[in-house]
Amino acid sequence: TRKQPNCNVYRSHLFFCTRQMDPICGTNGKSYANPCIFCSEKGLRNQKFDFGHWGHCREYTSARS
């Protein structure tokens, strides 16, 4: 299994990310296109979320109406 991304690698160029697709799901339930974008959102915006797993987040819909 892959380790979570090392956000220190992206510190010098936050928000100057490529369009490479390597999706990450954050613990906030939001999908990020790649580790650079994930780290940028987490670092610069001081958000309270962490790495969830590699791949897109699954959207859960409630069966209740």
UniProtKB/Swiss-Prot annotation:
Q: Keyword set for this entry?
A: Disulfide bond, Glycoprotein, Protease inhibitor, Secreted, Serine protease inhibitor
Q: Name one GO molecular function term.
A: serine-type endopeptidase inhibitor activity
Which tissues show it? Seminal plasma.
Name the coiled-coil region(s): none
Q: Per its UniProt record, what Gene3D superfamilies does this chain match?
A: 3.30.60.30
Q: Give disulfide pairs as residue numbers.
A: C7-C39, C17-C36, C25-C57
PROSITE patterns, sorted: KAZAL_1, KAZAL_2
User: Does Secreted count among this protein's keywords?
Assistant: yes
**Entry protein name:** Seminal plasma acrosin inhibitor A1
Record organism: Sus scrofa
